[in-house]
Amino acid sequence: MTNSARDFATSIKPTVLVVDDSTMMTSLAARILGKDYNVLTASSGEECLELLKTKKPHLILLDVTMKGMDGFAVLKALKSNAKTAPIPVIFMTSDENNETEIRSLNEGAVDFITKPFIPGIFLRRVKNTIELSLLQKNLQFEVNVQTEKFKKLTRQIMLALSGTVDAKDHYTKGHSFRVAKYSVEIARRLGYSEQNQEDIYAMGLLHDVGKIGVAGDIIRKDTKLTDEEYQNIKEHTITGYNILKTITALPGLAIGARWHHERFD
């Protein structure tokens, strides 16, 4: 467990929701868990779902056989709701049928406890499940942070490359940025996904990167180009393609550079 996950786990008292139509079982679970956890109880599946509209426990202990909604019906409802789906669920039952245990795990429960349970084992399995859940959340947070850092770095590199082209061709200064900006706005209005918009933005920024391979005196020439010079200019699409084709994570970059002067008509 990472330090940040451990610190978080120890800085708050996690909440456990116990769902069982037996008051004896909910009382027993509350006594065992009460020292280390905030314990909420519900005597039916319906009450459980109603309670979850305002509460978000770290773990749900769910009885399988209850009047009205049984445990499987409750679990299905939990997993179909984006707000409750991430909450880990441990099934509790006096049924020692292996098929019940297999079904519960297949349908999304993280563990299965047979009643009557041994207090020490019961407490340890609850603790392990909550710690694992907190660790997974912490890891996901770290992944998201690193992903955002990578995206930021990637965009900075792309801006630097497009800036290099602009520095060489002062007649079209800011051209690549404007192309990227207008392209992503068109994509947004067409209903493209956020990821597709980001990809199109990158293609716009780097579509002219091949001009790096064109001689500066040709790019900056303010008189008519010779046939040879014009041919040299046209080759910037191929140069750009060769520069960007190694970026296999986003093949659209190379495609955009290679064909951005082609016309559909």
What annotation goes with each model-predicted range?
Residues 22-41:
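Two-component/phosphorelay signaling modules centered on CheY-like receiver
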Residues 55-61:
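Active-site beta3 strand of CheY-like receiver
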Residues 162-265:
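Metal-dependent catalytic cores of enzymes that make or break cyclic nucleotides
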Residues 116-126, 130:
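C-terminal output helix
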Residues 66, 104:
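Receiver (REC) domain active-site loop signature in two-component systems and cognate sites
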